[in-house]
Swiss-Prot record:
Pfam families: BRCT, DNA_ligase_aden, DNA_ligase_OB, DNA_ligase_ZBD, HHH_2, HHH_5, Nlig-Ia. This is DNA ligase. One of its GO terms (biological process) is DNA repair. It comes from the Bacteria.
Length: 693
């Protein structure tokens, strides 16, 4: 329903109809992309629809409604969160940690129900924040946190920014559903790196990151953090003719919600245990963090018989994975200087096996963290991987101290340049090097610039970068492109003529890298690879991005106000302008002129396993350059699955759905044959790809 009263009569009927059509179309494509993982239009076509809707809503602000897709980008600053009462209490779950206990749970269930076997639904337990979502006539009206289970906080404005949460359902239902809001692993890692660079304390785990984000008063900040969702529960399922949890999951997907694809219907508790064992080993394949399996009695009539306690249902239980912690000892603490000057203490550890890798170092984040946790050199400590990826010290073990342990004190000067250290503001946690010319800052910036994700200058490793900066040959990132054989020869032992020639050749090749790789290499705060690609696709040149206004940037899907502000501030800096000019004079490609071929146009691909000639990112880029659509999961709409070494569950699903599979070698032959049919030279395509990548 549009707002606007008397003014509505002045708006042309065709405009109202176009706005409604655009909203329906955009929500449909959001559903295809974020829920089904199966888009049917290009990003460019989607952006065009969104820009048109934004344009019409600006011309006719009376047409803006709370459920418009344009409201997802955030921009409001909230005064606080009001308390709301849940229609049905949001209970917690009892936990179990081993197979014996889950078998006991099954025995209790069967005894109460007087059944010989009970069917269960096993669902991955997402490490996120519980959420209740309400809809009236298919339109989103409320998002509330669990709170104490009886009352929660109204976080509707922040929930709107989450792309996988539909603002309109695919049916005009009045319904309440529940699920989990989570932060993907890559986003968690990016956010913590960014926070450490900015001198802020990192989040301990993805759940804390999601919870902290959902309670932000600035909705634009929430939008920039790319939260995601899985929905798994229907309140009053009998109102919709649902008799089992498994039916409810299919129903949720049909009406527009993102449902975890790995849930499984189990005939008995033994199948539940097999599922738990499988995902205990496979959990690192996922792009979100899971800490166990939720086991639910499938039939709703059985659930009613079993009932619940005041705290938890008797028909469900959390079957947790073993905690991944290890005990080790701190041998020393070193200080790293970040790109923005933040001094980060790093614990040097006795090597210890943890979650499949040997851990020798762990970030201590900042000196306030060290003080709060009472961590000392020589302490025995517990280490775990935050979000399954980042080693961090959870706690020290004071009981094992001998008296020889040493306190960890903040440095009085920068350990690299000897310059003054301090805080940018009294309430800042981080201590920084205040010297604007500190070589450590430049070294970190250069490592980002030449990394594989950016300009990929392999010959410029850490040691050579250190020598280039220490010798004064490189004073900013653009100076890389002005190096001469004579400059490199001055760097001392190990830099022979062949090495020099190789480095200079790689630097020359780096000038032709795609625009998004250059943008990534600049190290703009909040701009990673994904955002860099959006900018390159939209603007086509670095200079156009540099000239773009805040208003233009914030309206681009995938950018939003916070990232837009960061980009504008970065390019407003006179030093940035100087660097761009130097890059231009050196012959670095500042424009996107990527040639695309329609060799695989109209075909949908998925990929599983490890490939020989491509990383996962590269094969996706390659397929998209050839006109294919790439999806993360296999469905009946997938044309081909490319299978590498050690394939995952996609391979089994492809076989079950009779989706065609091909090895990497078969795929390349397939491309060669399709190229010939369309009149393209395969060798030219591959040469162009190598230059572009």
């Amino acid at each position: 329903m549009f707002r606007g009263g008397e003014k509505m009569r002045q708006i042309p009927k065709e405009v109202i109809e176009e706005v409604e059509r655009l909203r329906e179309e955009i929500e449909y494509h959001n559903y295809r992309y974020y829920v089904l993982n199966d888009p049917v239009i290009t990003d460019e076509e989607y952006d065009r629809l969104m820009r048109r809707l934004i344009e019409l809503e600006r011309m006719y602000p009376e047409l803006v409604t709370p459920d418009s897709p344009t409201q997802r980008v955030g921009g409001k600053v909230l005064e606080g969160f009001k308390t709301v009462k849940h229609s049905v209490p949001m209970l917690s779950l009892d936990n179990t940690y081993n197979e014996e206990e889950i078998i006991e749970f099954d025995k209790r269930v069967k005894k109460t129900l007087q059944e010989s076997e009970v069917e269960y639904v096993a669902e991955l337990k997402i490490d996120g924040v519980s959420i209740a979502l309400r809809y009236e006539n298919g339109r989103f009206v409320l998002g509330a946190t669990r709170g104490d289970g009886v009352e929660g906080e109204d976080v509707s404005e922040n929930v709107k920014t989450i792309r996988s949460v539909p603002l309109r359902l695919r049916k005009p239902l009045t319904i309440e559903v529940r699920g989990e809001i989570y932060m993907p692993v890559d986003e968690f890692k990016r956010l913590n790196e960014e926070r450490e660079e900015e001198g802020l304390p990192p989040f301990a785990n993805p759940r804390n990151a999601a919870a902290g984000t959902l309670r932000q008063l600035n909705t634009a900040l929430v939008a920039s953090r790319r939260l995601d969702s899985f929905i798994y529960y229907v309140v009053h399922p009998e109102n919709y003719g649902l008799k089992t949890q498994w039916e409810a999951l299919q129903f949720l997907k049909e009406i527009g919600f993102k449902v975890n694809p790995h849930s499984r219907l189990c005939k008995n508790i033994q199948e539940v245990i097999e599922y738990w064992r499988e995902w205990k080993e496979r959990k690192r394949e996922l792009d979100y963090w899971v800490d166990g399996v939720v086991v639910k009695v499938n039939r709703f009539d059985f659930q009613k018989v079993l009932g619940e306690t005041s705290k938890a249902p008797r028909w469900a239980i959390a079957f947790k994975f073993p905690a991944e912690q290890a005990r080790t000892r701190i041998l020393d603490v070193t200080i790293q200087v970040g790109r923005t000057g933040v001094l980060t203490p790093v614990a040097e550890l006795e090597p210890v096996q943890l979650a499949g890798t040997i851990v020798k170092r762990a970030s201590l984040h900042n000196f306030e963290y060290i003080r709060e946790k009472d961590i000392r050199i020589g302490d025995y400590v517990f280490v775990e991987k935050a979000g399954g990826i980042i080693p961090q010290i959870v706690k020290s073990i004071p009981e094992l101290r001998t008296g020889s342990e040493k306190e960890i004190k903040p440095p009085q000067s920068c350990p690299v340049c000897g310059g003054k250290v301090g805080k940018l503001s009294p309430d800042e946690v981080a201590i920084r090097c205040l010297n604007p010319h500190c070589p450590a800052k430049l070294k970190r910036a250069l490592r980002t610039f030449v990394s594989r994700e950016a300009l990929d200058i392999e010959g410029l490793g850490e040691k050579i970068i250190d020598r280039l900066v220490d010798s004064g040959l490189v004073k900013d990132i653009a100076d890389i492109f002005y190096l001469t054989p004579f400059d490199l020869a001055q760097l001392g032992p190990g830099i022979g003529q062949r090495t020099i020639a190789k480095i200079l050749q790689e630097i020359e090749e780096a000038k032709k890298r795609p625009l998004h790789k250059l943008i990534t290499g600049l190290g703009i705060p909040m701009v990673g690879q994904k955002t860099a690609k959006i900018l390159a696709e939209h603007f086509k040149s670095l200079e156009a991005i540099a000239e773009a206004s805040y208003e233009t940037l914030k309206d681009i899907p995938g950018i939003g106000p916070e990232i837009a502000r960061s980009i504008v501030e970065y390019f407003r800096n006179p030093k940035t302008r100087e660097i761009i000019e130097k890059l231009k004079k050196a012959g670095v490609k500042l424009e996107e002129k990527t040639v695309k071929y329609d060799v695989l146009k109209g075909l949908t691909f998925a990929v599983t396993g490890t490939l020989k000639n491509f990383t996962r990112e590269e094969i996706i880029e390659f397929l998209e350059r050839l006109g294919a659509r790439v999806v993360n999961s296999v469905s009946k709409n997938t044309d081909y699955l490319i299978v590498g070494e050690n394939p995952g569950s996609k391979y089994e699903k492809a076989k079950a759905l009779k989706v065609k599979t091909m090895s990497e070698e078969e795929f390349l032959r397939f491309v060669e044959n399709r190229a010939k049919l369309k009149g393209y030279n395969f060798d030219e395509i591959m040469r162009g790809w190598k230059e572009w990548s």
